[in-house]
Curated annotation (Swiss-Prot):
One of its GO terms (cellular component) is cytoplasm. SUPFAM superfamilies: LDH C-terminal domain-like, NAD(P)-binding Rossmann-fold domains. Allosterically activated by fructose 1,6-bisphosphate (FBP). Its EC number is 1.1.1.27. Belongs to the LDH/MDH superfamily. LDH family. It comes from Allorhizobium ampelinum (strain ATCC BAA-846 / DSM 112012 / S4) (Agrobacterium vitis (strain S4)). It comes from the Bacteria. This is L-lactate dehydrogenase. Substrate binds at residues 79, 85, 117-120, 145-148, 227.
C-alpha cells in the first residue's frame, strides 16, 4: 500500500520510520511546507531501507499522493504565547481546510489518519471538512494511552503487555477513562490474574498506574521535548490493520453516532479496523464510575468541537 504523510516533523517522520521498519508500505511520500525538511527526512529513512524492507521512501507534493490508500495528517501550528486553546484550534482548523482539500484532490479514495493534537477535535474537524463517512476518518485517539496502560500493567504483573487486554476510552487527554473494570490478562479478568500471580492490584497500584498513563507525555516532554516514537509506532499499527485487512480491535478516535448519551462526537472506543477503515464500534461494559467519566469526557469533547467553526 502507498502511504502519504503530511507533516515531516517528529511524529510524521517517526511514523514513516516505523512503517519502513515493519515493511508495511510499498511506498511512502512525505509532504511538508518545509520542503528541505521533508527531503532530508525521506533521504535519511531511505538509507535504512536496505537493512529491513523494499519500501520506497521519498519527498513530494500533494499530487504525489495519487493512489495512496492511507494519508497520515500530522500537520498543525504550535500554540503562541498567550493564545487560548480555542484560538489555536481555529488556526489549526484553517490549516486542515487547506490540507484536507489538497489530499482528497489527489487521493479521493484514501483513508485519512489524523495524528495532529488535540486529536479528537482535529478528527471531528477533518470529518466535517472532508465530507467523508466517519469510518474513513480515523484519529490516533487513545491508541498510545492504551499501549501505556498495557505496558504499565504488564510491568507490574510481570507479564507480556501483549497478553494484557485493557483499553483507555474517551479523550486523548485529561478526561480519558482507564477501563479497569473489564481489563483482562489472557482469558482471565485482571483482578483474578493478579490474585493468582500474587500481585494484588491495590488502590495504591491503581493510582500509580493511572498517574503513569496520564502523565507519561509530560514526563517524556520534560526530558526530551516531545513524544514521537510511541505514536509513530501506533500510527504504523493502524496502517498495518488497514493495509492487511486484519480486522484488529484498536482504540482509535472517530465521529461516533452516540457515545454515553452524547451524539456525533469524536472520541475513542475499541474499534474493528480493516481495509475500508472502521468496520465496527465496540463499547465495553463499564462500571458506574467509568460510565459517568466517559459521559463527561464525551460531553466535553462535543462542546469543544462545536465551538470551532470550520
Amino acid at each position: 500500500m502507498k502511504v502519504g504523510i503530511v507533516g515531516a516533523g517528529m511524529v510524521g517522520s517517526a511514523s514513516a520510520y516505523a512503517l519502513t521498519m515493519l515493511g508495511i508500505a510499498s511506498e511512502i511520500v512525505l509532504v511538508d511546507y518545509n520542503t528541505d525538511l521533508a527531503q532530508a527526512q525521506a533521504e535519511d529513512i531511505s538509507h535504512a531501507v536496505p537493512f529491513v524492507s523494499a519500501t520506497l521512501v521519498r519527498a513530494g507534493d500533494y499530487g504525489d499522493f495519487a493512489g495512496a490508500g492511507v494519508v497520515i495528517i500530522s500537520a498543525g501550528v504550535s500554540q503562541k504565547r498567550g493564545e487560548t486553546r480555542l484560538e489555536l484550534l481555529g488556526r489549526n482548523a484553517e490549516v486542515f481546510r487547506q490540507v484536507v482539500d489538497q489530499v482528497l484532490a489527489a487521493a479521493p479514495n484514501a483513508i485519512l489518519l489524523i495524528a495532529s493534537n488535540p486529536v479528537d477535535i482535529m478528527t471531528d474537524i477533518a470529518t466535517r471538512l472532508s465530507g467523508l463517512a466517519p469510518q474513513r476518518v480515523i484519529g490516533s485517539g487513545t491508541i498510545l494511552d492504551t499501549a501505556r496502560f498495557r505496558s504499565l500493567l504488564g510491568r507490574y504483573l510481570e507479564i507480556s503487555p501483549q497478553s494484557v487486554h485493557a483499553y483507555v476510552l474517551g479523550e486523548h487527554g485529561d478526561s480519558e477513562v482507564l477501563a479497569w473494570s473489564n481489563a483482562m490478562v489472557g482469558a482471565v479478568p485482571l483482578m483474578s490474574f493478579a490474585k493468582q500471580a500474587g500481585k494484588p492490584v491495590t488502590d495504591t497500584v491503581r493510582s500509580e498506574i493511572d498517574a503513569g498513563v496520564r502523565h507519561a507525555a509530560d514526563k517524556i516532554i520534560k526530558g526530551k521535548g516531545a513524544t514521537y516514537y510511541g505514536i509513530g509506532a501506533g500510527l504504523a499499527r493502524i496502517v498495518k490493520a488497514i493495509a492487511s485487512d486484519q480486522r484488529d480491535v484498536l482504540s482509535v478516535s472517530s465521529v461516533t453516532a452516540e457515545l454515553a448519551g452524547v451524539t456525533n462526537v469524536a472520541a475513542s472506543v475499541p474499534r474493528v479496523i480493516g481495509s475500508s477503515g472502521i468496520l465496527m464500534d465496540l463499547v465495553p461494559d463499564l462500571d458506574e464510575t467509568e460510565r459517568i467519566a466517559l459521559a463527561k469526557s464525551a460531553r466535553m469533547l462535543k462542546d469543544l468541537a462545536l465551538s470551532v467553526p470550520c
